[in-house]
Amino acid sequence: MSNQPYDFIAIGLGPFNLSLACLSEPLEGVKSLFLEQRSQFDWHPGMMLEGVTLQTPFMSDLVTLADPTSKYSFLNYAKLNNRLYPFYIRESFFLLRKEYNLYCQWVCSQLSNVSFEQSVTKVEFCQQSECYTVTCKTPNGEQHYVTRHLVLGTGPAPYIPDCAVQSNSNNVLHSSDFCHRLDELKAAKRVTVVGAEIG
């Protein structure tokens, strides 16, 4: 455990916290840490359909609207990874979901304040120090971190109503598992879609 507390620790690494990691890393005097339980960034892997785009233009990447000069912009990623001209030639301001995921993975590889395989098991607040102690389970054992502030970005959990689960759980799936069960769905004689979300 470090003696000096972090200014903030963020738990979970989706696009929101990844954006915060990009914007906070270059700030002098701000000590931050981003903890993620998975082994790498993987944005909605069960929903990576071929040819599907984001619903917002590329300028709403992780940083551009807050800091257009950031080295973590999508355009910088595209230039450094020989993707700028293919993106331009595609003639769409809307990123493919797969390209966005690759962009986010690239950003993670550039950041020094991101730590994977850190499953947070406990958070305790100490009145005396006015700090939180964050306990994580890692492949190398238990880790403890101290921070003045917490940022939670754990994202929503897939929800299937009890009545659907009880009816026949083998035939019910959440859209987040769609690509993982695509062959099974293609073989099905009937498919019913219930509910929808925009976003």
What role is predicted for each listed range?
Residues 3-33, 191-199:
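N-terminal Rossmann-like FAD-binding beta1-loop-alpha1 element of flavoenzymes
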Residues 117-121, 138-139, 177-179:
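Conserved SAM/SAH-binding loop
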Residues 35-99:
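Glycine-rich active-site loop/strand segments that organize a redox cofactor
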Residues 9-11, 120, 134, 144-158, ...:
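Short hydrophobic core segments
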Residues 97-115, 120, 153-158:
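Helical element adjacent to the flavin cofactor pocket in flavoenzyme catalytic cores
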Residues 116-132:
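A conserved short coil-to-beta-strand element within the FAD-binding core of flavoproteins
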Residues 4-6, 138-149, 186-187:
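Core beta-strand elements of the Rossmann-like FAD/NAD(P) dinucleotide-binding domain
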